[in-house]
Amino acid sequence: MSSSSPGEPLEPTDQDLDVLLKNLGNLVTPMALRVAATLRLVDHLLAGADTLAGLADRTDTHPQALSRLVRHLTVVGVLEGGEKQGRPLRPTRLGMLLADGHPAQQRAWLDLNGAVSHADLAFTGLLDVVRTGRPAYAGRYGRPFWEDLSADVALADSFDALMSCDEDLAYEAPADAYDWSAVRHVLDVGGGNGGMLAAIALRAPHLRGTLVELAGPAERARRRFADAGLADRVTVAEGDFFKPLPVTADVVLLSFVLLNWSDEDALTILRGCVRALEPGGRLLVLDRADVEGDGADRFFSTLLDLRMLTFMGGRVRTRDEVVDLAGSAGLALASERTSGSTTLPFDFSILEFTAVSEEAAPAAQASEALPAQE
């Protein structure tokens, strides 16, 4: 048994080596899982294709290559049985997580044709990301993440489905956490498919809303508002939030926007929002913003942070970092509240800011240049 002095690293054990080889340093299994998810292997097995020949026929794959994939999935505990065992091939309890109908939605998250797993392939460029600080997504796919989603309907639809797979967690709980009774007009900046603004408008039938987004998500938001019967109160403006915003409002909302951007870009976004505030207005920032920076689970916190860095050059910030960034844009924290959700794998809150000076928030001048919507 090895010994070491206090403060010195311990000698790794054979068990440590096993963990490194099989879990931490292994790229084969993560890709095998993604291929299984993309081919919907578990769903085909559940539908009766319980032999390799039947599975290859259903998935239009090379039988021998598929058999080697299945063998590895069996070794790692995703599948069990097979012809050599004299039993039908079937998913294990773990493998059932890859069924399309499972509420954890892991098949969709791992599907290589879906937005997140597609983007995860950019992690092959993580070395360059760490060396340069620049995201890898555009280098792999030819255009930045958000531009790609705006232009590719299939990717965008998969992204929207993943982000709103639990409407209660994604939109309803945060919408319930704030008092909208005195709000006249909400300007949702970078509001995606409109899920958050729709949840707010349905809870506050007196207010009007405007969503600013790129062309692709803007069109999806229009459909959502129309389907929800909100088209008479909620409008969509196609635009780039790095440019002047199209209207002013008494509440400007940034919902999970800032973590997608570098400090420099996030500051530009915040300053644009300040200019769109009407006198006495409030900026609401719904974001990952916990006190310590570790979230409810450090694994998900650091995983999300590296994804933000690799996909689009963003970063997950602590609550204090968000407050400091807002302060640089001329904002002061007025209040904060939890989102109303206790089940997300990382902490987030609603931070409410007000402009601290006329210089930082020239609302009177802005309201002359931008049409206010009552």
Swiss-Prot record:
Site (Required for 4-O-methylation activity): 260
Required for 10-decarboxylative hydroxylation activity, annotated site positions: 307
Methyltransferase found in the keyword field: yes
Keyword GTP-binding in annotation: no
Activity control, per UniProt: The hydroxylation reaction requires S-adenosyl-L-methionine (SAM) as a cofactor. S-adenosine-L-homocysteine and sinefungin (a SAM analog) can also support the decarboxylative hydroxylation activity with 10-carboxy-13-deoxycarminomycin as substrate.
Alphabetized PROSITE patterns for the sequence: SAM_OMT_II (PS51683)
Binding, S-adenosyl-L-methionine: 171, 190, 213, 240-241, 255
Catalytic activity: 15-demethylaclacinomycin T + AH2 + O2 = 10-decarboxymethylaclacinomycin T + A + CO2 + H2O; 10-carboxy-13-deoxycarminomycin + AH2 + O2 + H(+) = 10-hydroxy-13-deoxycarminomycin + A + CO2 + H2O; 10-hydroxy-13-deoxycarminomycin + S-adenosyl-L-methionine = 10-hydroxy-13-deoxydaunorubicin + S-adenosyl-L-homocysteine + H(+)
An annotated Gene Ontology molecular function: O-methyltransferase activity
Keyword annotations: Antibiotic biosynthesis, Lyase, Methyltransferase, S-adenosyl-L-methionine, Transferase
EC number(s) on file: 4.1.1.-, 2.1.1.-
Cited Pfam families: Dimerisation, Methyltransf_2
InterPro entries in the cross-refs: COMT-like, O_MeTrfase_dom, Plant_O-MeTrfase_dimerisation, SAM-dependent_MTases_sf, WH-like_DNA-bd_sf, WH_DNA-bd_sf
Pathway: Antibiotic biosynthesis; rhodomycin biosynthesis; Antibiotic biosynthesis; aclacinomycin biosynthesis
Any one GO BP annotation for this protein: antibiotic biosynthetic process
Subunit structure: Homodimer. Homotetramer in solution. Tetramers might not be very stable in solution.
Reported function: Involved in the biosynthesis of anthracyclines, an important group of aromatic polyketide antibiotics used in cancer chemotherapy. Acts as a 10-hydroxylase to catalyze a decarboxylative hydroxylation reaction on anthracyclines.
Family: Belongs to the class I-like SAM-binding methyltransferase superfamily. Cation-independent O-methyltransferase family.
Domain comment as written in the entry: Contains an N-terminal domain involved in dimerization, a middle domain and C-terminal catalytic domain that binds S-adenosyl-L-methionine.
Protein name (Swiss-Prot/TrEMBL): Aclacinomycin 10-hydroxylase RdmB
Organism: Streptomyces purpurascens
Gene: rdmB
